[in-house]
Regions:
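A glycine/threonine-rich phosphate-anchoring loop and its flanking beta-alpha core
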Residues: 1-65, 169, 175-176
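C-terminal charged capping/lid subdomain of soluble metabolic enzymes
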Residues: 174-261
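Short alpha-helical scaffolding segments that buttress acidic/His motifs in well-ordered protein cores
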Residues: 39-43, 101-112, 126, 159, ...
């Protein structure tokens, strides 16, 4: 009972149609979860293991689909974060705000272009078992007849703990991401990077009225071992963590995601 993803360069589309009319009747809860997924897509691709740290293939055509953070994906990721910071709250407050819905569609595509090359890492890896093993949780706004955690919600609930964990790998990049999300980093030190970025993510989670931890889905400390087991099989994503992440690290990350606020 673990969600997973399938990725291959042959699955990439050649055309995308971004029409805000298609999202006009989207419930605000769905817009919130999807928008926070955009946030984490961009944040994870920007903080992923740098592409130069990946094993070099025999020839360029054999590179993995997810290559790690790189200068081109960075451009898309940072702009996506800026778009989310400005327009996601507007979409949540007013579904008739066509400019905001259109800009969020663009922001989603920016983030997708970035992580489609760089990849995502720990928040998504941790989200898969949380979404796959949930029992008895029915999210507002989804008209669901079965237990489910919306994808973006299952991702973002782990992002603050991961930010605090990964910040020592590249404090300046984490501060850049926080600034793109609207944080004031003028007096910030490298040691502050993880906390500043985590708190900025939590700020948007609260604005979007998101659950404050995986306890809200019904999970407890006793469930952490099986959630860790479900994460360890996500090798494609774990390889992109900027820091070595095994069972011990995941255990602590899940523990820190039980209750954020």
């Amino acid at each position: 009972r673990v969600k997973t993803g399938i990725a291959n360069r042959y699955m990439r589309p050649i055309l995308g149609v971004l029409d805000p009319e298609n999202t006009r009747t989207c419930p605000k809860e769905v817009a919130a979860s999807a928008g926070l997924d955009v946030l984490s897509h961009a944040l994870e691709s920007f903080t992923a293991l740098p592409f130069l740290c990946r094993d070099k293939p025999e020839r360029p055509s054999m590179r993995t689909a997810y290559q790690g953070s790189n200068p081109i994906s960075d451009v898309w990721a940072l702009e996506a974060l800026r778009v989310v910071a400005e327009f996601l709250p507007r979409v949540f407050q007013n579904s008739d705000d066509e400019e905001a819905r259109g800009r969020m569609l663009l922001g989603s595509s920016y983030a997708g272009t970035g992580f489609g090359n760089a990849g995502v890492h720990l928040p998504h890896a941790m989200a898969y078992p949380v979404a796959g093993q949930v029992e008895g949780y029915l999210p507002a706004g989804y008209n669901a007849d079965h237990s489910m955690v919306p994808h973006g919600t299952s991702v973002i609930v782990h992002t603050p703990a991961v930010c605090r964990f990964t910040a020592p790998s590249a404090p300046e990049r984490h501060l850049q991401a926080a600034a793109a999300l609207g944080a004031d980093i003028r007096d910030a030190s490298p040691d502050d990077a993880g906390e500043i970025l985590a708190e900025r993510v939590i700020h948007f989670m609260k604005l979007m009225q998101q659950p404050g931890g995986i306890e809200d889905f019904g999970y407890s400390e006793a469930d952490i071992p099986r959630l860790v087991d479900g994460t360890l099989v996500q090798a494609r994503l774990l390889k992109l963590s900027p820091l070595k992440t095994g069972a011990a690290e995941l255990t602590e990350l899940f523990r820190n995601s039980l209750r954020l606020y």
